[in-house]
Swiss-Prot record:
Bias (Low complexity): 402-413
Region feature Disordered, mapped onto this chain: 324-463
Protein family per UniProt: Belongs to the RxLR effector family.
Subcellular location field: Secreted; Host nucleus
Taxonomy, superkingdom: Eukaryota
Biased composition range(s): Polar residues: 327-346, 418-428
Alphabetical UniProt keywords: Glycoprotein, Host nucleus, Secreted, Signal, Virulence
Protein known as: Secreted RxLR effector protein 104
Annotated domain remarks: The RxLR-dEER motif acts to carry the protein into the host cell cytoplasm through binding to cell surface phosphatidylinositol-3-phosphate.
Residues that carry a glycan: 175
Gene: RXLR104
Signal peptide: 1-24
Length: 484
């Protein structure tokens, strides 16, 4: 037995060293032949020896105790980790149940899938082309993937309305009665053409806003909202998109061949198609709103078509001299200032400014600026107060500087031709019965009286106005329009 003891001890030590080495711990022997359980570490096999070693003397018992302590510590750690493992195993069924519940994003994807499926189904229906024509503008706009416009990047994009919201038709009810098509606001009739033209220049070719849409966006910008204007504008855009869908539904209902097929579709496909149309209209309206808010074409309207310019006023002269008017009123005054005069041969154009004295008898006309060249050496012909005019060409009217005693007069060229005046509310001509309202009608006393005698002093210092289409406009004397 005594001979077997050392052999068993050696085998146990070797086995314990292998176990300890595999576990990553090392045993450390101390000279006082004691090893604490907490700080017991195992050495590697290359540095450890059996009994009789020169480094460690008679430490077999310590080696055995260290092995047991390490094993006990490992078992304790394993026991501590067991509850956590059990908790994970318990949570697995709950995780499976949670995964079955689809999140909000998954529901959106599902709705989009139904919308795409509904669109494919509708494309196979008869007379689908009529339904597609009703929303062609919105479809063409979305085909461009809403890339930023090269002409609409100026401005602060921080105030834009973001279009990352998906709308749903299920949140509102249908009412196909009492819907009227969009029209131009009455307050915008005088300027809608120039503002619409300026809006087209800053929009992408795929947007193509109409005159009525331009008037609608213009009206939004004139809302007087102290707080949260963008939120109110967004709500208005959503309501307008819903209104567009209802109008599309009414058009489809008026088509006898399409409506029965629409009624036969299941509700899921119906709502899918309506969601698709609603978001198309909303995305297009948001796009136009952001471009209009950045560039404000209502403050810088485009000139009218240069083809409408009368003879003699071609070139770089603007069609209208427009001042900024933040209140949204038409900048056309109701009283004209002056008009461009022509010679007998129609070769000269002069800038003139009316200076009415207190007695109302004399006028002083001034030479034009250096840009205008007088080609004729003849004397300046006096202006007529009441020319006979007819035709389609028109010129805006402007208010003049005059004293309280001087009457308001309309000045027009003496050249017979097509000349009329456009005021804020109506188009006025001075040929008698064709004019419904004529606030500038002159008395018979001044019919044959010349406004500028040949002895009038003409000085360049008096020139402070700008030549425009058929008239002279003085921005420094601009006042709010007065109703006739």
């Amino acid at each position: 037995m005594r001979s077997a003891y050392p052999v068993l001890t050696a085998l146990l030590v070797v086995a314990s060293s292998q176990i300890a080495a595999g576990s990553g711990h090392q045993l450390q022997a101390y000279d006082h032949d004691r090893i604490t359980d907490d700080n017991a570490v195992m050495k590697s096999l290359s540095t450890r020896f059996l009994r009789g070693s020169r480094d460690v003397h008679n430490n077999v018992a310590n080696e055995e105790r260290s092995v047991y302590s390490v094993l006990a510590r490992m078992i304790k750690k394993g026991i501590k980790k067991m509850p956590r493992t059990a908790e994970v195993l318990k949570m697995k069924p709950h995780i499976k149940k949670a995964s079955k519940k689809s999140p909000h994003e998954a529901r959106l994807v599902k709705e989009l899938f139904h919308a795409a499926e509904a669109k494919e189904t509708m494309q196979g229906a008869r007379e689908y082309k009529k339904l597609r024509r009703a929303t062609r503008a919105a479809v063409e706009a979305l085909e461009k993937h809403w890339n930023p416009s090269k002409t609409a990047v100026s401005g602060d994009a921080f105030h834009d309305i973001h279009s990352n919201q998906m709308l749903s038709v299920k949140k509102w009810k249908f009412n196909l009665t009492g819907l009227k098509p969009m029209v131009v606001n009455d307050e915008h009739h005088g300027m809608i053409d120039s503002v619409h033209k300026a809006f087209l220049t800053v929009c992408d070719k795929n947007v193509k806003p109409t005159r009525a849409e331009t008037s609608y966006l213009w009206g939004l910008m004139n809302w007087k909202l102290a707080k949260y204007p963008r939120r109110s504008h967004k709500e208005s855009l959503i309501e307008h998109a819903q209104r567009r869908v209802l109008l599309d539904m009414r058009k489809m209902k008026a088509t006898k061949k399409v409506w029965p097929e629409w009624e036969n579709l299941p509700d899921s496909l119906k709502f899918g198609v309506l969601d698709y149309l609603l978001n198309l209209h909303y995305q297009r309206l948001v796009r136009m709103y952001n471009i209009f808010a950045r560039n404000r074409p209502d403050r810088n309207p485009a000139p009218l078509n240069p083809e409408l310019n009368p003879v003699g006023n071609t070139g770089t002269s603007a069609a209208m001299a427009v001042a900024e008017n933040p209140k949204g009123q038409s900048p056309y005054p109701s009283t004209p200032l002056t008009a461009a005069s022509t010679s007998k041969g129609g070769r000269s154009n002069l800038k003139k400014r009316s200076k009415r004295t207190s007695d109302g008898n004399t006028d002083t006309a001034s030479f034009p600026s250096k840009k205008l060249k007088v080609r004729s050496s003849k004397s300046v012909m006096p202006l007529l107060t009441e020319p006979t005019t007819s035709g389609d060409h028109s010129a805006p009217a402007k208010k003049s500087k005059s004293s309280s005693s001087g009457p308001s007069r309309a000045f027009a060229p003496d050249k017979s031709g097509d000349q009329t005046f456009i005021t804020e509310n109506s188009r006025l001509s001075f040929d008698g019965p064709s004019s419904a309202v004529d606030p500038f009608k002159q008395s018979k006393v001044h019919e044959s009286k010349s406004l500028a005698p040949s002895s009038s002093v003409l000085t360049p210092e008096d020139v402070d106005t700008e030549l425009s289409l058929g008239g002279i406009y003085d921005r420094s004397t601009y006042k709010a329009p007065s109703k006739p």
